[in-house]
Amino acid sequence: ENGTMEASIAAILHENGVFDVFPDEVLKQADAIPQQVDLASAGKRLDLRDKLIFTIDGDDAKDFDDAVSLEKLDNGHYLLGVHIADVSHYVTPDSPLDSEAFRRGTSVYFPGHVVPMLPFALSNGICSLNEGEDRLAFSCLMRLDENGEIRSYKFVKSVICSRVKGVYKEINALLEPPESETDADLTDLKTKYEAVLDQLPTMDELYRKRLVLRKARGGMDIESNEAKLVMDENGRCIDIVKRDRGTSECMIEEFMLLANQCAANAGRTNKAPFVYRVHEAPDAEKMEKLSATLLACGLNAKFKNPIPTQLELAALLDETRGQPIQIPVHTGILRSMQKARYA
């Protein structure tokens, strides 16, 4: 029916060549895959089901493709695990599922609606790291020293069982309880997260150490005014709010970056074919526009050279964080960056 949310989504999908319905042969292959893990056919795997592994996502997440775990050793070192759903065990090369996933390339998300890259039997079922269910995973197991530096890592095929379906805003409330939070509210949250409650401060501790290291090498945290649409039960937008990033969002982002860093290092060490995402230095014209933005905000930034270093830009970001001029300055720096390219 014209004018409805469903009609609008259907029109957008059609215009962009995205199909909401899977071919019969793809659905047939998906439906034939058991919804319980069969360890007998899963090959040699490291059994991590006794480890305190759990997912952390937004409260509207429906599929869970990554989970984390952390242990602190007696010598002050950390054992960090990032566990990714092992989709490749079920989607074999050149199969109907593989060909359709390749054709789609990605899942397409609308507020309250998703067109998955794989049928829901996989994306929300056997390939989703659902709470309390055994799942096959590909795990990056990292050892970090007392300062948060990576000392060693390994990649293994594993079988895991997520203990808790974590939610960002709930974990943020546990890590940094807001003044409005009552003891009863926190008691309920502590009950839900009882199995992993002791891990959360340790995760926060490691994240803070990683943050210090990232700042030292000029890592840039750019704040933006990302919006979130609030939908009612009928799929209609009833509000637009600022999407806030709390400690847990930043923490998980850092842990995923660590796993990516290990993967890139493994690829380089083994001289494996790899796709690199490259950010080149800003050009002079964009720097002139940035300087104009900074002057308009009352800042007279003194860079040593026409093209500032990453450390100089990172210092400018930190200097304006939390200030009234944060958004224009951070947005100006973001726009001064070259678009990423793949090589």
Where are these predicted regions, by residue range?
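Charge-lined substrate channels and their catalytic hotspots, especially those that engage the 3′ end
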Residues: 1-81, 88-134, 165, 172, ...
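Short loop/turn segments at secondary-structure transitions that flank enzyme active sites
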Residues: 2-3, 62, 87-88, 116, ...
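Short, well-ordered loop/turn elements at secondary-structure boundaries
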Residues: 49-50, 63-64, 73-78, 104, ...
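Structured core elements
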Residues: 53-55, 67-69, 79-83, 89, ...
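Short, flexible loop/turn elements at secondary-structure junctions
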Residues: 57-60, 72-74, 84, 114, ...
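Catalytic palm subdomain of template-directed nucleic-acid polymerases
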Residues: 71-74, 78, 83, 93-95, ...
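Conserved catalytic alpha/beta cores of large enzymes that bind or transform nucleotide phosphates
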Residues: 108-216
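Append "with occasional cross-activation on large, charged helical scaffolds in nucleic-acid assemblies
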Residues: 155, 170-343
